[in-house]
C-alpha cells in the first residue's frame, strides 16, 4: 500500500486505468478467466453508425456494460459481441447531406456505385469513432469482432431468413398501402414514423348524388390532395343521417349530413336557412352512387364507380361521412379490399401527381391542396385550418403520405398468436413492458413490409423472371453463385443487381430493385452474430439470447422485428429476458435537441467530472425503465460522493503505512478470513459496518439480478455517504491514533480494509475505474491483477447482524437528536455535557443504548447516557386550555376556567387525565356564575370544577439548561449546564482543534512531533485548562513540549507558525514548530 494524494482527479485516474487495461489486455484476461464458465449470451442492440453518440446511447451502453460485468464476476462466460447497424436511411440521409443531394434523382446522377462506396466509408469511419467513444466510457465489449450488418456473412443471415419465410409460405408480394416518404422515395415502417403537429386544411366537400338534382353527400377531410383518388364514401350503419333543405344567397340545395351534426355543418357553410326534411339510417344509404366533384378536371375520376359503403371506423364528428381513398390510407385500403373497391393511387414515388390526374399532374401532393380547393368551386362547402398530429419520416423529417405500392411482406399477422404466446415466456424488466406495452403492440400487428426502395442496405434476395414472372428467393451467396454461374464479390447494390439467373422457362431472372427494411437487418442479429447459417455449433449452444436491453421505443422496433423474424424462421422468441429502458431527457422532461439548445453530450460531462460519475449518475438517478431527466445538480451530488469515497479510502493509509500494516492474507491471497474468524471479538462499530456492507451486498446482488440498477447504485452511494463516511469513520478515527501495538487498532485496520475490499468488489460493475485504482493499491501479492477478475461476493450471512444494525439505527437517530438539542441549547458538540437522557416507551431503545452505550457517550460527548422508560421525573408538564372544548362545556365561564387551568399544577392534571380520571379545579369566589349556567357536571358544594382530557393539551416544562429533541421511538434530553470540569475540557478541545488545523497548514505527517506555545488572555481559563488538560492536549497533538500560560502577548515569531485565535470569546495565541 502507498499513500494517496488528497486531490481526487477522476480524469487522471481514468486515463491511467484505461492505459493499464490496454497494456495488460485486462479485458482479454477476464474473458479467458471465465471461458469455461456457463455461457451468458448477450446480443447488443446495434446503434446506427451516424456519428457522435448522445447521452441516451451512452446510458444504454452503461446499462449493458454494468450487467455484463456483473455476470462476468459471477463466473459466466459472457458472449458480449458489440454490434453496429451500418445500413439504411440513417446512413443514406447523412451521406446525402454531405454530398448536397435533395432527391433520389441526385443519387442516380451521381452513380449508385459511388454512392454505395460513400455510404460504406461513412459507416466504417463512424463505427471506429463510436468504438473509441464507447471504450472511453469504460465499456467492455468485443469491439474488435463486432457484428456489422454490412459484412457478407451477416447479409447471408438475412437472406437465409427470408428464404425460410418463403419456404413456410410466409412471404408475399402484394400491392398495399404503406407509409411513404416522398423525399426518400421509399416505404417506411410504422415504427419509423415520428409524430408532431402540422397545420392542414380542414375542408367540407359536397359529393353530388347521381341522378339527383342539387342533392349531395357532405364529407370532411384534412387531405384535399387525396380527393383525386376518391372511390367511395363511408357511413355508420346505425348512425342517423338527415336530408336537409338549405338556402344560401337565394340558391336552394339538399344536403345529407349526420343528424346530430346538421347545425354545426350548415353554420360552417353559412347557410341562411335550413331544415331537416327526412332522416335515414346509414344502412339505408349503402349502395347509393355519386359523382366526384373533380370528375371534370381529373380524368381518372370518370372511370370510377363511386358508391356509399359502411365502415365501423366512422365517427359521429365533422359530417359523419368519410371520404374513402383506398390508395392513400390503411383503413381505406382494408375497407376497399373488403368492398372490392378500386385501389387508386395516382401519385408517384416523389409524391407528385401522375398524368391521369389531369390539371394536377406533376404537382407535389401537399403543395396541391390549394389548387384542389380552387377546382372544387361551389362543391366546397367550407374550409378552415386544423392543427393535428401528423406523421413524418424518422430520418429526413418530411411529412409522410400513404401510398399504395407493390411491396414484399412477411405475414406477421398470421404469426400473431404465436408471437403473443412467446412473449409470455420471456422475462421482462419491468414486467409490464412485456405483459402490457409490447403485448398490446403485437395484438395490433400487421403484415410487415420488409422492402425499401433505396440503395444502401441488404438487397432483397428475390429474382423474378422477365418472361413468366416466377420468382426465386436465394438463401446464401453460394446458392446465388451456383444458380447464376457468376462470382458475387460484394452482395450489395449495384454489384448484386448485375447477377442474373436462368429461368426454367427460358427467360432471365433479375433481382428486384428493393433492399431490406433496415429493421430486418437488426432483426436477424441474434443468429447472425454467432455466424448462423454458415456455422451452426455456437447457434445450437447459445441461441436464443439470454439477455437484451434497449429503449422503450424498441417495443415497436428491435424487440418486435426480432420476434417477428424469429417466430417465422424458428417458431420461437430469440431472447429469454429483456430490459426496457427509458429516454434521456433534459431536466424539464423535454427531448434533447439542438433547436432547444438543451443537448448535453457525454463528453461534456466526462470533461467536468469523469466517466465513473457519469456512469453512477445515469444508473442511480432513475429506474432503467423510467425516463432519465438529466440535471447537473444530480451530477454534482454523485461527484461529491466519489470525492468522499476517495477521502474514506485515503483516511487510514497514513496510519496503516506508519504501522507497516499488512492485512491477513493466506499465501498472499486475501479472502476476508481475519474478519470472519474474529467477528465476535471485534468492537460493536466494527461488527456493525461489516454487517452493513454484507447487507448492502445482498441488496446490490438481488437488485442487479432484477435489472434494478438504480436500487443497486443508490444503495452503494448511500452506504459510502451515510454508513461509511458520516458514521463509521467518525467512530473509528480515535482508534487509528492509538500508539504502539494495539489490538483495537489492528481490529480497526482489518475492518476498514475488509469493508473497502468488499466495497470495490460491489462497485466494480458500475464504476470500473475508481474501483480498479483503489483495488490496485489494496490488493495483496497474489490477488488477481484486476478488480474485474475478482469473484462476485454477495451477502455473507454469517457476518450479518440485523439486531445490531437496528440498534445502530436507533443510536444514529439518537445522535441526530442530540445535535438538535445541543443546537437549541447553544452548546457545541466539542464541549462535553454531564448527562443525556432518553425517554422512551420501547424497551428495544433501552436495549440498543445499553449495548452501544460507549458509542452513544462518544457521539453525544456526554459523561453518561441513560434511558428512562415511561417518564423522567425532571420533566414537568404545562397544561394548556383547549378553548373550543371549554366553550362547549362551560359557555361564558370558559375564560374563568381557562385561568384556573393555567394557574393549576400541570403535572397533577396530566397524572389524572393519563389515569383516565377527571381533575378537580377549586373555584375562587366570584369567578364562576350560578350552577344553572354550567353545561357539565360540577359539585358546587365542594367549590370545584371537573375537567377532562378533552379540555387540555400538554407541553413539556423543562428545567433550566435542559433541552430536548425527538428521536425514533423516544425523546432526547441534554443537560447543557457547565461545571468547571466540563468547561476545562471544552476549552481544551477547542485548543486541540486549532493546533490540529495548524498542523495541517504546515502539512505535517501523522507521526511528526511538534513544540507548542499557548498564550491565554484569560487567567481563570488558563488555570482551569492547565490544571487538568495540559498532558491531554500534548498527547492529542503529538507535542514534545507544551507551554500553556496566561499572557495577552503574542507567542512570538520563533515558531514556524503562530496565529491569534478567538476561542469562545477568549483571546489566545498559539505557536507551533516541528521537532527536528
Swiss-Prot record:
Residue interval(s) of motif 'HIGH' region: 47-57
Any GO molecular function: ATP binding
Required cofactor(s): Zn(2+)
Motif interval(s): 'KMSKS' region: 591-595
Keywords, comma-separated and alphabetical: Aminoacyl-tRNA synthetase, ATP-binding, Cytoplasm, Ligase, Metal-binding, Nucleotide-binding, Protein biosynthesis, Zinc
Residues involved in ATP binding: 594
Catalytic reaction equation(s): tRNA(Ile) + L-isoleucine + ATP = L-isoleucyl-tRNA(Ile) + AMP + diphosphate
InterPro entries on file: aa-tRNA-synth_I_CS, aa-tRNA-synth_Ia, Anticodon_Ile_ABEc, Ile-tRNA-ligase, Ile-tRNA-ligase_type2, M/V/L/I-tRNA-synth_anticd-bd, Rossmann-like_a/b/a_fold, tRNAsynth_Ia_anticodon-bd
EC number: 6.1.1.5
Pfam family name, one: Anticodon_1
GO BP term (any one): isoleucyl-tRNA aminoacylation
Cellular component aspect of the GO annotation: cytoplasm
Location of this chain's protein in the cell: Cytoplasm
HAMAP family: Ile_tRNA_synth_type2
PANTHER family: ISOLEUCINE--TRNA LIGASE, CYTOPLASMIC, SOLEUCYL-TRNA SYNTHETASE
Family: Belongs to the class-I aminoacyl-tRNA synthetase family. IleS type 2 subfamily.
Entry text on domains: IleRS has two distinct active sites: one for aminoacylation and one for editing. The misactivated valine is translocated from the active site to the editing site, which sterically excludes the correctly activated isoleucine. The single editing site contains two valyl binding pockets, one specific for each substrate (Val-AMP or Val-tRNA(Ile)).
Assembly information from the UniProt record: Monomer.
Protein function: Catalyzes the attachment of isoleucine to tRNA(Ile). As IleRS can inadvertently accommodate and process structurally similar amino acids such as valine, to avoid such errors it has two additional distinct tRNA(Ile)-dependent editing activities. One activity is designated as 'pretransfer' editing and involves the hydrolysis of activated Val-AMP. The other activity is designated 'posttransfer' editing and involves deacylation of mischarged Val-tRNA(Ile).
Listed name of the protein: Isoleucine--tRNA ligase
Record lineage: Archaea, Methanobacteriati, Methanobacteriota, Stenosarchaea group, Methanomicrobia
